C-alpha cells in the first residue's frame, strides 16, 4: 500500500481528492521518502508538548480545551504552512478520529492528498483503559520527542 501512496504523492496534477488511512509505520516511511510531505499534529497544544510528538510535526489543533470546539482557523493555519494543495498532508491525533475529521475539512478546502494516521500517537484503549499498549506512533517505536 505504501508504494501506491508514494506514487500517488508524486502525481501533482490530479482532479480528485483522496483520504488514505496509513498506520504509523507507513506514515513514517512516507515522510522519510517524500520531502514534500507535511505532518500536521491536530491534537491540543498541551498534548503535543507534554505527551510528545513526532520530530518535525507541525502543531495545528483541530480542537482546543476547554470548550473542545472545532478550531475555526484550522484550515487557514494549514494554508499558511502548506501552499501546494497537491502535497501529501499526514494528519495525526491521539487515536485517529480528530485527524480524520480534520482531513475531511481540508478535503473540502481543496487539498488533494490527505493521509489519516490510524491509531494516532497513542492508539486505542486497552482492557485497563490505558493508551499506548495496543497501537499508535509511540507503540510502534517510531521517533518522538517532547517540547
Spans of model-derived segments:
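Rhodanese-like catalytic fold shared by cysteine-dependent sulfurtransferases
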Residues: 1-37, 45-88, 99-147
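Conserved G/P- and acidic residue-centered "switch" motifs that form tight phosphate/ATP-binding loops
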Residues: 41, 96
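Short, surface-exposed ligand- or partner-binding patches at beta-edge/loop junctions that are enriched
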Residues: 92
Amino acid at each position: 500500500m505504501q508504494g501506491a501512496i508514494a506514487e500517488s504523492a508524486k502525481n501533482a496534477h490530479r482532479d480528485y481528492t483522496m483520504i488514505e488511512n496509513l498506520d504509523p509505520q507507513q506514515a513514517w516511511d512516507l515522510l522519510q521518502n517524500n520531502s514534500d510531505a507535511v505532518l500536521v499534529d491536530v491534537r491540543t497544544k498541551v498534548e503535543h508538548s507534554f505527551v510528545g510528538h513526532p520530530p518535525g510535526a507541525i502543531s495545528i489543533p483541530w480542537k482546543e480545551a476547554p470548550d473542545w470546539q472545532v478550531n475555526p482557523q484550522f484550515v487557514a493555519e494549514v494554508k499558511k504552512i502548506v501552499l501546494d494543495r497537491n502535497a501529501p498532508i499526514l494528519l495525526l491525533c491521539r487515536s485517529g478520529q480528530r485527524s480524520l475529521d480534520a482531513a475531511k475539512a481540508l478535503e473540502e478546502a481543496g487539498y488533494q492528498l490527505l493521509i489519516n494516521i490510524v491509531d494516532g500517537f497513542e492508539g486505542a484503549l486497552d482492557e485497563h483503559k490505558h493508551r499506548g499498549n495496543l497501537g499508535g506512533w509511540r507503540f510502534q517505536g517510531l521517533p518522538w520527542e517532547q517540547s
